Regions:
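N-terminal beta1-alpha1 ligand-phosphate binding loop
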Residues: 1-3
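A short beta-strand-loop structural module common to alpha/beta enzyme folds
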Residues: 5-14
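Anionic-ligand binding patches
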Residues: 7, 18-169
């Protein structure tokens, strides 16, 4: 997008219970507001991504065994990926909040395919234990919605939100 930025950890406890969309939105707001306290003259972006499968919120795996269990759950099924973003600009008293939802249909994958995938990708730092941009074709059948949302941030909507907040990049 051509925007210079710096990453500042929010260092806050994340909400992990309730409706998956509300979890993502509440975490994004909390992250943005925590950082905006120290950077009131800058536009701050807080984001959170949550995966939902059949009513269950799926986060990052605790270990490789947990990653294999998560990938087995996702096998052959469609799940939602929701990313919420909160833009906070305290100096201008602006706040913009939105969420983007995409869906991912997994291929039916067996234990050998799961082991192979885990051996190639650092699954421990990824919600759902996978990354669409890293060997995703081995486990993903189809994607509906924004691929950028699944990979990281929904840049299409983010560009519009930045302009709406008066940020000209």
């Amino acid at each position: 997008m051509g925007i210079n930025f710096r990453v500042v950890p929010a260092n806050i406890p994340e909400v992990n219970s309730g409706d998956y969309r509300a979890i993502a939105v509440n975490n994004a707001i909390a992250k943005a507001e925590a950082v905006a306290e120290d950077y009131p003259y800058e536009l701050v972006l807080g984001a959170d991504t949550v995966i939902e499968l059949e009513g269950e919120v799926i986060g990052k795996p605790a270990n490789l065994n947990d990653a294999a269990i998560i990938l087995k759950k996702l096998s052959g099924k469609k799940h939602a990926v929701v990313t919420a973003i909160c833009l906070s600009w305290r100096e201008k008293k602006l706040q913009c909040i939105f969420a983007e939802t995409s869906s991912v249909q997994f291929k039916t994958i067996d234990d050998a395919a799961i082991s192979s995938y885990i051996s190639k990708v650092n699954v421990l730092d990824k919600a759902g234990a996978y990354a669409a941009q890293e060997y995703g074709s081995e486990i993903i059948d189809t994607i509906s919605g924004s691929i950028n949302n699944i990979i990281g941030l929904p840049t299409e909507k983010l560009k519009l939100a930045l302009l709406a907040c008066g940020y000209n990049y």
